[in-house]
C-alpha cells in the first residue's frame, strides 16, 4: 500500500476495507482471541459475536459491514497504522493524557491525531494553519505543545 498523504481522502468504508485486508493468518488468532476475551468480560462494543468467528474471512466480513456493527478500536487503528504507514497519536479525555498504544515509537513521516472521548469514541483532530484544517501532520513538525505532552506522558519524542 502506498504511503498516505494530506491529499488522500478515505471514507469510513475504505478505511474498514483497508483494515480488514491487514488481517492475516499470523495476526488473526491474537485479534479474535482479544475480541472473545472482551466479550467474555462484557467489555465488547460490537453487534456481532466473536465466538462465532471461525476464519479470517468471517472477521473481515464483520469489519467491513457499515454502521455500528463493528466499532473502531485500538486493534483496527494498529491495522490501519501498519497499512497506511502513519502514526496515530491518541489523546484521552481522562488521565494519562495519551492513550497507551505502544506505537508512539513508530518512525512514520506522518501522524494523525485522535481524541478518545469517554473511553468509547474516537474523534479526528485537526490543526488550523492559514485558515485550513489539516488532519494529517508531519510527525517531525507537530506543534511543540503536542511534543511536550508526548514527552511528558511517554518519556519519548
PLM region spans:
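Papain-like cysteine protease catalytic cores
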Residues: 2-99
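Deubiquitinase catalytic domains
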Residues: 60-157
Amino acid at each position: 500500500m502506498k504511503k498516505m498523504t494530506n491529499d488522500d481522502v478515505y471514507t469510513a468504508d475504505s478505511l474498514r476495507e483497508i483494515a480488514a485486508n491487514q488481517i492475516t493468518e499470523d495476526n488473526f488468532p491474537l485479534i479474535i482471541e482479544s475480541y472473545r476475551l472482551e466479550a467474555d468480560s462484557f467489555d465488547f462494543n460490537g453487534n456481532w459475536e466473536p465466538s462465532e468467528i471461525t476464519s479470517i474471512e468471517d472477521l473481515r466480513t464483520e469489519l467491513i459491514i457499515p454502521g455500528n456493527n463493528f466499532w473502531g478500536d485500538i486493534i483496527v487503528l494498529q491495522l490501519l497504522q501498519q497499512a497506511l504507514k502513519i502514526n496515530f497519536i491518541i489523546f484521552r479525555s481522562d488521565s494519562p493524557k495519551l492513550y497507551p498504544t505502544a506505537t508512539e515509537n513508530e518512525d512514520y513521516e506522518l501522524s494523525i491525531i485522535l481524541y478518545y472521548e469517554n473511553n468509547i469514541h474516537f474523534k479526528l483532530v485537526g490543526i488550523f494553519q492559514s485558515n485550513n484544517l489539516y488532519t494529517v501532520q508531519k510527525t517531525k513538525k507537530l506543534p511543540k505543545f503536542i511534543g511536550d505532552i508526548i514527552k511528558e506522558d511517554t518519556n519519548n519524542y
